[in-house]
Structure formats: structure tokens, C-alpha cells
Design a protein with these regions (language model features):
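Small-residue-biased structural context
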Residues: 70, 78, 149, 201, ...
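A short, hydrophobic beta-strand/beta-hairpin element that forms part of a small beta-sheet core
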Residues: 25-37
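Thiol-based oxidoreductase modules, predominantly thioredoxin-like and allied folds used
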Residues: 1-14, 25
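Short, contiguous alpha-helical
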Residues: 84-129, 168-224
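Acidic/histidine-rich alpha-helical segments that form the ligand environment
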Residues: 66, 70-76, 131-167, 174-193
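A short, structured beta-strand/loop element
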Residues: 17-23, 112
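Non-globular targeting/processing and membrane-anchoring segments
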Residues: 6, 43-113, 126, 165-167
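C-terminal structural segments of small proteins and small subunits
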Residues: 34-36, 40-46
Length: 224
């Protein structure tokens, strides 16, 4: 399938095209007059007429994968030297401090959306300094541990989430199950990117996850 790829962070023309359409979030897929916001496998399959079911992790798998992924992200975050907090990620134009925080904040915002009934575009890009203050990687990792504890309690506690609950999001309506699954895939994708950034800095991750650990989680095929 032929397509045009736009990079709004490095290509002003691509950014201008989105703004002219009234779009202020990425990623976004435009096909004719239709727009799909975010990495949304269900809507992308519908848009392009793709056959087959879009996998969404079941409850037990989701709990297991969240624990595996967020614990690995905490390990990797703790390995980063303090002088890397302001290192700018080449493809993302955001600091490594903000990037690592983002790995953990997306699941937290998904849980928050369950309580307030809405997941906004502002939820997807919070700055760690607005939430945690001027902290380092250790504090971000501790935040990740707190988020994991909340996720496990919400999914596997005595009063688990109603995963069929419908929520309003900037991507359209989603069930709580879909939103938690998307947040999990988002954390996986960014963990893979973090491993690449660590490699660029000559840092070898401790007990890194491999593809087998990511089985059953839907993520984009391209690293960036």
C-alpha cells in the first residue's frame, strides 16, 4: 500500500498540514476524508478493510504483562545516569526524563480516565515536572512502581475495574479494556525505544525483555 509519511517534529510542512485540518495530536492516519487518531488497531483495520480480529489482552494476561513490562522499565530507568535527564531523544524532541516518565504515566492516565469518564489529549503528554517536581530517574522509577501497584489493584483487586465501561477519549469512545490495552502497548513500544536510546549511550540494560515477553501485546511494528 502506497502512503505518504509525515514527521511533524522535523518537517514544518507536515505540521502545517495537520494544523490546517484542525489536528493537534499525533500519530494520526488520514485516508481520504477519514481520520484515525492515535495507534488504534481496531479503527485502522476498519479504515483499510483488514480482516481478522484485533487482539486485546484478557484480564490475566494484562496483569501479567503490565507487571513484566513496568518492572523492566523501572530497572532500565534506574540505570540511566543523572546527566541524561535533559538528553534529548533524537526522534521525539523530548528529554529522556520526560520520556521515561511517559512510559508510566500513560497507564496512570488510563486509570484516571476510568474514574472521571474521559481521556483527553492533555492526558497523553503531561510533563513530569508538573506531576513530580524537579526529580531524577530514581523518583521516576518509584512513580512507575506506584503506577504498577495501582494497575494490579485495579485489575486484580477485590473490586476490579468494569472493563466493559465505555469512556470518552480524544480517539473516540473506548471501553476500559481497550484503553488499558492501548496503554500497555504504548508502554511496551516506549520501553523498546528506551532500550535503543540506552544502546546509543553505551548502556547495557539489566535483564532486558525480549520479543517473547511482548507476545500478545499489540504495538506498532516500526520502532520509531
Amino acid at each position: 500500500m502506497d502512503f505518504d509519511e509525515g514527521d511533524v517534529e522535523h518537517d514544518p510542512a507536515s505540521l502545517e498540514e495537520l494544523l490546517e485540518r484542525g489536528l493537534k495530536v499525533v500519530p494520526v492516519t488520514i485516508w481520504g476524508d477519514e481520520v484515525v487518531i492515535g495507534f488504534n488497531p481496531k479503527e485502522l483495520s476498519r479504515l483499510f478493510g483488514l480482516s481478522g480480529e484485533v487482539a486485546v489482552a484478557d484480564l490475566s494476561t494484562m496483569i501479567e504483562k503490565y507487571e513484566t513490562v513496568l518492572e523492566a522499565a523501572c530497572r532500565a530507568t534506574r540505570q540511566l545516569p543523572p546527566d541524561h535527564m535533559d538528553w534529548e531523544c533524537p526522534e521525539r524532541k523530548r528529554t529522556l526524563g520526560r520520556f521515561t516518565f511517559h512510559i508510566f504515566d500513560r497507564p496512570e492516565r488510563a486509570l484516571n480516565a476510568y474514574n472521571v469518564g474521559m481521556y483527553s489529549s492533555e492526558d497523553r503528554g503531561r510533563n513530569f515536572k508538573d506531576v513530580l517536581g524537579s526529580v531524577g530517574f530514581e523518583e521516576i522509577a518509584r512513580y512507575g512502581e506506584e503506577v504498577l501497584s495501582r494497575v494490579k489493584s485495579a485489575l486484580g483487586g477485590p473490586s476490579p475495574l468494569d472493563l466493559d465501561k465505555v469512556l470518552d477519549t480524544y480517539m473516540g469512545t473506548k471501553t476500559a479494556n481497550e484503553l488499558m490495552d492501548l496503554a500497555l502497548g504504548h508502554s511496551v513500544h516506549h520501553l523498546k525505544q528506551l532500550y535503543e536510546y540506552m544502546a546509543q549511550s553505551g548502556i547495557k540494560p539489566v535483564d532486558p525483555l525480549g520479543e517473547a515477553d511482548f507476545q500478545g501485546i499489540t504495538v506498532p511494528t516500526e520502532l520509531f
